[in-house]
Amino acid sequence: MAMSDRLDLVNPSEIRKLFDIAAGMKDVISLGIGEPDFDTPQHIKEYAKEALDMGLTHYGPNIGLPELREAIAEKLKKQNNIEADPNKEIMVLVGANQAFLMGLSAFLKDGEEVLIPTPAFVSYAPAVILAGGKPVEVPTYEENEFRLNVDELKKYVTEKTKALIINSPCNPTGSVLKKKDLEEIADFAVEHDLIVISDEVYEHFIYDDVKHYSIASLDGMFERTITVNGFSKTFAMTGWRLGFVAAPSWIIEKMVKFQMYNATCPVTFIQYAAAKALRDERSWKAVEEMRKEYDRRRKLVWKRLNEMGLPTVKPKGAFYIFPRIKDTGLTSKEFSELMLMEAKVAVVPGSAFGKAGEGYVRISYATAYEKLEEAMDRMEKVLREKKLT
């Protein structure tokens, strides 16, 4: 199938559609887009200015600046217990989102299947389709905190299955995989000879004394894992567009070819700033301050949603919460439209994240505390007036 045909199979993100509608309305509180409301820490901006003054305005290596790859290797070893060679097992990208299409294109053949636990981030399935593969949804359930269960994976694996995508902490559910979960997933991947793409962009935003574990740190897993991460969420740098992957050298080699004829290279002065940021304690202090504030907001939204009659699992990570709206009698799309038009609150229908997301909506609490309070008041008022809970 030609790429043009594959593009016809991919639909625009439901999240973006909602965002575009909300942007044309007045007095809307958007709890839709998953973006930190914090500004990039000032010292990171200063590093970027420093790089510009140094003349770092030219092309860099396709694989990324050596200084940044070395800083990433240090971070992976210290924080994730992953040993990766910065010269051939780490690559810098123009945003972490690039990793899915580029990574899948490194090994996936036409018609091969990729298991995607759902509800899932909206970019996964389109990336599989554009790479020539077939996305296979594997449902996760509220009763298990939306954590992936290997017993479910066993129901969907076939001879055509080539890879598995995992996301912990998870967008949209906020679930966090336990070490035991990852060990079972790793055994499953080895048994079926699968490549694992592990999306860990929310790793620093975890709560209730939960710990983050990287599947690539487990014995025998680095050689079959593409670890995806970035700077957008960690340091509130979404507009800077910078991500990275750690993977076996044969995968990195192919991804570099993709980047060579696509973006060429990530922005040079931004890479300089990111390398400095990773080694600056002020950056990690800022991350912890953001985490604490997200936690405060999480507790507020979780409490209010349950009080207004929308049963909600308490998320352990990221900055999303996934309330159940089935008892209202509305579909997730109908519920989202009602909240946008009547309450002027933008939330994302769970159906945007796969079949398992129907009956839920995603709320981002990466929004000022006072706005969240107002949004909860508005939502509760509409639910009471319409007698939906």
Curated annotation (Swiss-Prot):
<dbReference type="InterPro" id="IPR004839">
    <property type="entry name" value="Aminotransferase_I/II_large"/>
</dbReference>
<feature type="modified residue" description="N6-(pyridoxal phosphate)lysine">
    <location>
        <position position="233"/>
    </location>
</feature>
<dbReference type="InterPro" id="IPR015421">
    <property type="entry name" value="PyrdxlP-dep_Trfase_major"/>
</dbReference>
<dbReference type="InterPro" id="IPR050596">
    <property type="entry name" value="AspAT/PAT-like"/>
</dbReference>
<dbReference type="Pfam" id="PF00155">
    <property type="entry name" value="Aminotran_1_2"/>
</dbReference>
<dbReference type="GO" id="GO:0004069">
    <property type="term" value="F:L-aspartate:2-oxoglutarate aminotransferase activity"/>
</dbReference>
<keyword id="KW-0808">Transferase</keyword>
<dbReference type="InterPro" id="IPR004838">
    <property type="entry name" value="NHTrfase_class1_PyrdxlP-BS"/>
</dbReference>
<dbReference type="InterPro" id="IPR015422">
    <property type="entry name" value="PyrdxlP-dep_Trfase_small"/>
</dbReference>
<dbReference type="GO" id="GO:0006520">
    <property type="term" value="P:amino acid metabolic process"/>
</dbReference>
<dbReference type="GO" id="GO:0009058">
    <property type="term" value="P:biosynthetic process"/>
</dbReference>
<feature type="binding site">
    <location>
        <position position="362"/>
    </location>
    <ligand>
        <name>L-aspartate</name>
    </ligand>
</feature>
<dbReference type="GO" id="GO:0030170">
    <property type="term" value="F:pyridoxal phosphate binding"/>
</dbReference>
<dbReference type="GO" id="GO:0005737">
    <property type="term" value="C:cytoplasm"/>
</dbReference>
<feature type="binding site">
    <location>
        <position position="34"/>
    </location>
    <ligand>
        <name>L-aspartate</name>
    </ligand>
</feature>
<comment type="similarity">
    <text>Belongs to the class-I pyridoxal-phosphate-dependent aminotransferase family.</text>
</comment>
<dbReference type="InterPro" id="IPR015424">
    <property type="entry name" value="PyrdxlP-dep_Trfase"/>
</dbReference>
<feature type="binding site">
    <location>
        <position position="171"/>
    </location>
    <ligand>
        <name>L-aspartate</name>
    </ligand>
</feature>
<keyword id="KW-0663">Pyridoxal phosphate</keyword>
<keyword id="KW-0963">Cytoplasm</keyword>
<protein>
    <recommendedName>
        <fullName>Aspartate aminotransferase</fullName>
        <ecNumber>2.6.1.1</ecNumber>
    </recommendedName>
</protein>
<comment type="subunit">
    <text>Homodimer.</text>
</comment>
<keyword id="KW-0032">Aminotransferase</keyword>
